[in-house]
């Protein structure tokens, strides 16, 4: 089975930046996720939510990319939340202790947001 191309769309919400992840989060997602983080950071919010609702697969390299983004965000004074995770990936985030460093939401965030050009695809 071929991996599904990863894209990340950045949205500017009232109190946060949202990165909506689509496709497979693996080593090929590096540039897109990095570009999305840069675009989200440029919005100036202190909180970023990673929405994984449309993310089909996350491998160990994808977890490492999330760790790097989380480290970068913390160094920049931003908090990161995860939303839209399947029960399986919630468990992975707990096992890998990512859940110790980011809030895990039960559902993807809703509410008004405008999309910015930061998909990095």
Each model region followed by its residue ranges:
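STAS-like cytosolic regulatory interaction modules
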Residues: 1-56, 68-121
């Amino acid at each position: 089975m071929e991996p599904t191309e990863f894209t990340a769309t950045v949205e500017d919400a009232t109190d946060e930046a949202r990165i909506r992840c689509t496709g497979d989060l693996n080593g090929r997602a590096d540039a897109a996720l990095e570009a999305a983080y840069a675009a989200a950071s440029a919005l100036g919010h202190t909180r970023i939510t990673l929405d994984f609702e449309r993310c089909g697969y996350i491998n160990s390299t994808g977890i490492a990319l999330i760790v790097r983004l989380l480290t970068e965000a913390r160094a920049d004074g931003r908090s990161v939340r995860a939303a839209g995770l399947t029960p399986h990936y919630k468990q992975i985030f707990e096992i890998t202790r990512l859940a110790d460093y980011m809030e895990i939401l039960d559902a993807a965030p809703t509410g008004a947001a405008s999309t910015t050009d930061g998909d990095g695809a």
